[in-house]
Design a protein with these regions (language model features):
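C-terminal amphipathic/interface module of NAD(P)-dependent oxidoreductases
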Residues: 246-249, 262-296
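NAD(P)H-binding glycine-rich loop region in Rossmannoid oxidoreductase-like domains
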Residues: 43-95, 99
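Substrate-positioning beta->alpha
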Residues: 139, 171-178, 190-213, 220
């Protein structure tokens, strides 16, 4: 049994990861911030958020792995809020790394990132591709910078897992598709719809976080994705068939003007590739149709 420390266990991906860890009977410590951790007797809760973690606590807990799924948010301020959140994240992640480096244990740190960090390209991105953050990632990158730097300097065992569009009942799909379908009875489209989108089910993403923590050959950056990629036009057609609703340009649906970052993200052409295909050789992914059908 491994000892696990989970940061961000109430979020979209973090809550699914917590279920995976519980299913595998890990010894789990969970950091609680504003939102309450679910009441499960197997969990040990650390209150006070990421600021509560220090080298002394790490030495006491002696985790084998720390999973980091948290990101500060100030949603009411939109772009300005993301800039504030990125500044906070940079400070918090720098402090966390410093405390981990001071500890006697120095557990591996597994951090969640996304494919928007690579930016638009007709070519697939592998782990050695340069970063060109677009959309929301322009602000998020500042918060991730201490962890990316640690990877490149190789001065602490950090894994950064970059996922494509994570599909589930929450996050982007809930905000921009499910809520639009319920409220406006239509499916939004963005741009000319010729861009390729790549998907992974949230349950698979959570399972694979645990897999990479144990099977990845070394610290570093890993692109984690399934082979499920579609042009946006085919994605919205699939949604239209499953939910039996028409496809309309987003400007016909949303009464308030969406931020340009939203439009840029959904019209972006980003496909992941990997230099480490062996890690996923025996993994069976949930199909895109199955994922969408489960959200009806």
């Amino acid at each position: 049994m491994n000892t696990i420390l989970l940061i961000g266990g109430t979020g979209f991906l973090g809550s699914h990861l917590l279920n995976v860890l519980l299913k595998n009977h890990e010894d789990i410590y969970v950091v609680e911030h504003k939102k309450k951790i679910k009441d499960v007797k197997e969990l040990r809760v650390i209150r006070g958020g990421i600021k509560a973690l220090n080298s002394g606590m790490i030495n006491k807990i002696r985790p084998d792995v720390i999973y980091h799924c948290a990101r500060p948010t100030v949603p009411k301020l939109r772009k300005a809020g993301r800039k504030i959140a990125a500044y906070k994240a940079e400070k918090l992640n720098s402090r966390l790394l410093n405390e981990l480096k001071k500890s006697k244990v120095q557990p591996s740190l597994v951090f969640v990132s996304g494919s928007l960090m690579y930016g638009n390209s007709k070519e697939a991105h592998n782990e050695h591709s340069g970063l060109n953050p677009i959309s929301f990632a322009r602000q998020y990158f500042k918060g991730e910078r201490p962890l990316v730097s640690a990877c490149f300097r190789n001065d602490y065992p950090v894994q950064i897992l970059r996922f494509p569009w994570i599909l589930g009942d929450g996050s982007w799909f809930k905000w921009f598709y499910m809520e639009a379908m319920k409220k406006y009875r239509a499916i939004p489209s963005f741009g000319d719809m010729k861009n390729t989108m790549q998907f992974i089910d949230v349950h698979d993403a959570a399972e694979l976080m645990r897999l990479y923590a144990t099977k990845a050959p070394a610290p570093g950056i890993y692109n984690v994705f399934s082979d499920q990629s579609l042009r946006q036009e085919d994605f919205v057609k699939m949604l239209s068939k499953i939910f039996r609703l028409p496809v309309k340009n987003y400007e016909e649906i949303f009464t308030k003007q969406l931020e340009k970052e939203v439009q840029e993200a959904f019209a972006s052409n980003i496909v992941l590739n990997t230099s480490y295909p062996d890690i996923l050789d025996k993994y069976t992914f949930k199909s895109l149709h199955e994922s969408l059908d489960s959200l009806k």
